Amino acid sequence: MGPIPGAPPGVVDAYVKQSLFPSCFANDLPARKAAVLAATQRPISTVTLGQPSGPPAWAEIPSWALVGTVDRVILPATQRFMAERAGARIVKVKASHLSMISRPGAVTGLIVAADRATR
C-alpha cells in the first residue's frame, strides 16, 4: 500500500506485492503470465472498500455465481456463503481469483447461461 497525494489520512492505494502476486492472486496461471499481470496491475484506493453499495441487486433479480475452488484471495467457502445467501445458481470451477483469465470458457458459459435463463 502506498499514500495517495492529497488524499485524507488513512486512504492509500492497495496492490498486491509483485513477489506474492503469482502465488496468491494468479496461482493457476503460467508463471510468465502471472509475472506480467503482477507488473502491470493497477492499484485501487482503499476508500472504495468502505463505501456503501446500496441495496443488493440479488434481492430483486436472479443471480449466478462462479466459485473459484483454488482462489486464495476470497476463500471458496466464503464465495459459496455469499452465493448461497444471494440464492445464486452456483458453478464451481477449478480456478484462482483470476478465473476470467485462467478459465474464460467457464466464465463465458456462466454468463451465457444466465442470459438465456432470464430471457
Feature map (PLM): residue ranges:
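Helix-rich cap/lid subdomain of alpha/beta-hydrolase
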Residues: 1-54
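Alpha-helical elements of Rossmann-like donor-binding domains used by nucleotide-donor carbohydrate transfer enzymes
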Residues: 20, 36, 78-81, 106-110
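Short glycine/proline-enriched coil/turn segments at helix->beta-strand junctions
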Residues: 42, 60-61, 85-89
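Glycine-rich beta-alpha junction loops
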Residues: 53-55, 69-70
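Small/polar glycine-rich anion-binding or flexible loop at a beta-alpha turn
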Residues: 56, 100
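Short beta-strand/loop motif that positions the catalytic acidic residue
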Residues: 59, 64-67
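Conserved loop-alpha-helix segment in the C-terminal half of the alpha/beta-hydrolase fold
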Residues: 69-94, 101, 114
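Post-His helix in hydrolase/transferase enzymes
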Residues: 101-117
